[in-house]
Amino acid sequence: MKIRLIRLWLSIGLLFTVSIAMADEKSCNELIAESEKLWADNQFDESDKRLDEAMKTCPKLAEPYWRKGRNIYERLESFDRNQKPEKKELIRLYMEVETFADKCTELDQKDGHCWLWKGVGIGRRGTTQGVLKSLFMASDVEDAWVKADSLGLTYRSEDGTSNAKCGVSYALGMFYRVVPEWLCHFPLKQIVGTCGDLKKSITYQRSAIACDPNAIDNNKELAVSLLCHGQKYNQPEEIEEAKKILVDLQSLPETRVFDKIDKEHARMLLADISLACGYQRDKQQEQSKEAYDNDKQ
């Protein structure tokens, strides 16, 4: 009789625990949904509050962490180059993006979104410091984004303006353009662990366009890669294709917080196509081998 009673109470206790866990999960999903709507309205601070609450309620749930990192990134991307925080503060904030992504991967190694935002955090820290000063981090960025791509990315915003699968193609395309191709020679590639590849950059950016043809940033980045490759390897048809893209994207609807900046930068690139290879939304990058050698002396 006692054993039966014990079993009964254990069953009731287990059922109660499961019910609480299910209620918490529902609550967290609701909080994440609220944070998503606030993110879509560029209300990043309010979105953060919902995510913080979700982290407390469901501490083993990975999703709120990559979303928190995304909020930091997009908040910073909304600033024009001349209006961003000081370099030291930028680096600190991008390290926060990476920290949130690391927590995300700890909770779910197979969530590709965690790896996508880990790469973003490291990558933006690198462009803030300068690509040539950050080459030691390049393979970490590449590895994170390749892993994200291989794991598969399912996130797509409700309004269709953000798609993680398109985003990782965009990110890798940008990576293979900004990291210099001269690193591909021995022994530099062996030291750094990776190198640029402009053909691969164009391939990834075309994939991003195929995935989301109306995204202003996808169009701009394809044009930038075409301009860079076209000038470097004397491909005038690529330069003309790029110029047409930069003109045409001006008529695309602005749906993301940084779209206005990207349209301005498209006009800037049309005015001076020599900027293409080292172009980044946050900061123009020095890429030359001479600058790299001088910096090492």
Can you say where each PLM-predicted feature lies in the sequence?
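Bacterial N-terminal signal peptides that target proteins for export
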Residues: M1-L10
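Extended serine/threonine-enriched, polar tracts that run as long, contiguous segments within proteins
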Residues: A208, D217-S225
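TPR alpha-solenoid repeat register
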Residues: P64, C114, C166-V168, N218
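Short coil/linker segments at helix-helix boundaries
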Residues: L38-K49, R70-K110, W117-C166, A171-S207, ...
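"A position-specific structural signal for the A-helix of alpha-solenoid helical repeats
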Residues: A33, R67, E74, W117, ...
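Extended ligand-binding clefts on enzyme/binding-domain cores
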Residues: T161-V168, K260, E264, A271, ...
